[in-house]
Swiss-Prot record:
This is Protein SanA. Residues 1-6 are cytoplasmic. The keyword Cell membrane applies. Participates in the barrier function of the cell envelope. It comes from the Bacteria. Residues 24-239 are periplasmic.
Amino acid sequence: MLKRVFLSLLVLIGLLLLTVLGLDRWMSWKTAPYIYDELQDLPYRQVGVVLGTAKYYRTGVINQYYRYRIQGAINAYNSGKVNYLLLSGDNALQSYNEPMTMRKDLIAAGVDPSDIVLDYAGFRTLDSIVRTRKVFDTNDFIIITQRFHCERALFIALHMGIQAQCYAVPSPKDMLSVRIREFAARFGALADLYIFKREPRFLGPLVPIPAMHQVPEDAQGYPAVTPEQLLELQKKQGK
């Protein structure tokens, strides 16, 4: 009896792993036509969306994923592949501001501040992609991130009827742990899209691109997110 239960458990685990692997491969296959590894092959679009991540690890070492995304954004902008850069990242806490950090580094690299737009409510990939259309009134854009992230972001875009392509910037050599976490992230994205039908945490007023944008001088300022929405989030975070 115990042996039968053990074998059944092994079969169940095996089927689950095969399902997760199959869904992972399906997502990669479905989005492959929209991913560009070479800048010269990338089509022109008015807006490039840079997906945020932390600049530094907790150890203080610079995050290579961040570095490659910023360099990719600089290359796409300087080559004329995009005219505007929408920096979408997490700013749920006043002490952590992904869009502002990206903005400072891009300006230091020569990007015109007037060509930079900030999205402080890109808490998840789904938020960033859907808000680009529903808040920033842009339905055809270039996503800038690593290939594995391109696949998930594009899958969300395709499901939502959003026309997007992705510029796949390099990944660090040692990315095994990140790739393993990506399995869970993709499974979560599928659940969000097909089961929970999730929308972005915040939407907010329409902020078309191009337009005149108020750019804050410090880590404050939350365009396209109302103060009431941010207060609600900070209460949930216990801040």
